[in-house]
Amino acid sequence: MAKYKVGMVSLGCDKNRVDSEIMLGMVQNEYELTNNPKEADIIIVNTCGFIEKAKQESINTILDMAKYKTSHNCKLLIATGCLTQRYGDELLELMPEIDIMLGVNDYAKINEAIMNFINGNNEKVKATNYSDVSINEGLRLITTDKATAYLRIAEGCDNFCTYCIIPKIRGKFRSRALESIVEEAKKLAENGVKELILIAQDTTNYGIDIYGEKKLHLVLRELAKIEGIEWIRVLYCYPEAIYDELIKEISVNDKVCNYLDLPIQHISNNVLKRMGRKTTKEEIIGKINDLRKNVPNIVLRTSLIVGFPGESCEDFNELKDFIKTIKLDKVGVFTYSREEGTPAAIMEDQIDEEVKKAREEEIMLLQKELSEEINKNKLGREYDVLIEKFNGEYYIGRSYEMAPDIDGCIYVKGNGAKKDQFCKVKIEKALEYDLVGVVCNESCK
């Protein structure tokens, strides 16, 4: 009997991508995988439920995939992820198109759920409460470029920012054991991975729950010992949780990219307090200065929320002044999304959508100008570039200054560049977010 074909649509963040990779790793031995939903007998939609825009995309995708039940081969539609965890039975009632629903802690049940359905048991699985990080993440089927992989070091969050639903969806903060992280990283390196990107809802507090103190610096130190790993990149660092040992490890460890993602969300103390952020403007600026002083050529990325309830014109202008003065290398900006079940959703002084959008556009324009200025200062510099693809005219890759998907890229001219390899590139042209360079002779490895 021919194997059923399974297709996957993964939505949302890179943490969701890891969940999708775990599920694909679990089903690949039992079923044939396909990227074409027209061919799939079983379609899995791993949803995002973080903000309204993401929820709508997830719902639309489920409905789009449900059409393949009548037009093509789909016999089973499975919804998983944050949306299913957040809404549970309510989602099943609203969307009868879903045959099976699994929450963010139910991925180990994926094969059992599929087999039960095939055998005629049509009971719809419900989302369960969070548990420890117990799934063997080594079973993952990596979906990124061969040389790059995300490595989750913790799950859940204890910060409880007033705008965020994640603690209710993903549960309390739980660190993975260091031995488990290193074991998975070794397997990734054996399969050709050169860049590890460490992720969690909060990477900087790694270890505080299981070791009694923050141990991210130790994770970096141990991962750097693995043969084949060239870059280690850290995302989702809470600025108030950055500590001296971590800064020192970044500065002395050649394999750790001089790059940090610091989602500060705002700079006005008024807004930070209403957001429930455990820091202040003064502390944030102090931490940025410490990083720049102690880590040469460090690149700092952040994300900002505009239009938060009570954000005054003065608060917004303070944010603009901060961006102009501090000149962070990479900035992502989002309009506040009013999410039911969060304290911010019932706050007074909600901001009109038109005002939110105007503020978002103003920040984006400001950062665009700064980004072009920052990039022009890179002209003539040489970078080690990890080549990811060839578009027919240029090789395309990234330097240590660029995380995949969220930052720019480097368009590379010249002979010798190879996919999934590093090569030395000299920058010849600066664009708003991207760079153009030429391969330095005999530099690829």
Curated annotation (Swiss-Prot):
Top-rank taxon of the source lineage equals Bacteria
Which Enzyme Commission number(s) are on file for it? 2.8.4.4
- Annotated residues that bind [4Fe-4S] cluster 2 are located at C157, C161, C164
**What does the record list as GO biological process?**
tRNA modification
Write out the catalysed reaction: L-aspartate(89)-[ribosomal protein uS12]-hydrogen + (sulfur carrier)-SH + AH2 + 2 S-adenosyl-L-methionine = 3-methylsulfanyl-L-aspartate(89)-[ribosomal protein uS12]-hydrogen + (sulfur carrier)-H + 5'-deoxyadenosine + L-methionine + A + S-adenosyl-L-homocysteine + 2 H(+)
Query: Could you tell me which residue ranges the TRAM domain spans?
Result: 376-441
UniProt xrefs under InterPro entries:
Elp3/MiaA/NifB-like_rSAM (IPR006638), Methylthiotransferase (IPR005839), Methylthiotransferase_CS (IPR020612), Methylthiotransferase_N (IPR013848), Methylthiotransferase_N_sf (IPR038135), NA-bd_OB-fold (IPR012340), Ribosomal_uS12_MeSTrfase_RimO (IPR005840), rSAM (IPR007197)
Kindly list the GO CC terms recorded for this protein: cytosol
Task: Tell me the cofactor note.
Answer: Binds 2 [4Fe-4S] clusters. One cluster is coordinated with 3 cysteines and an exchangeable S-adenosyl-L-methionine.
In terms of PROSITE patterns, this protein maps to: MTTASE_N, MTTASE_RADICAL, RADICAL_SAM
Which residues are listed for [4Fe-4S] cluster 1 binding in this entry? C13, C48, C82
Among NCBIfam families, the record links this protein to: 30S ribosomal protein S12 methylthiotransferase RimO, MiaB/RimO family radical SAM methylthiotransferase
Q: What is this protein called?
A: Ribosomal protein uS12 methylthiotransferase RimO
Gene encoding it? rimO
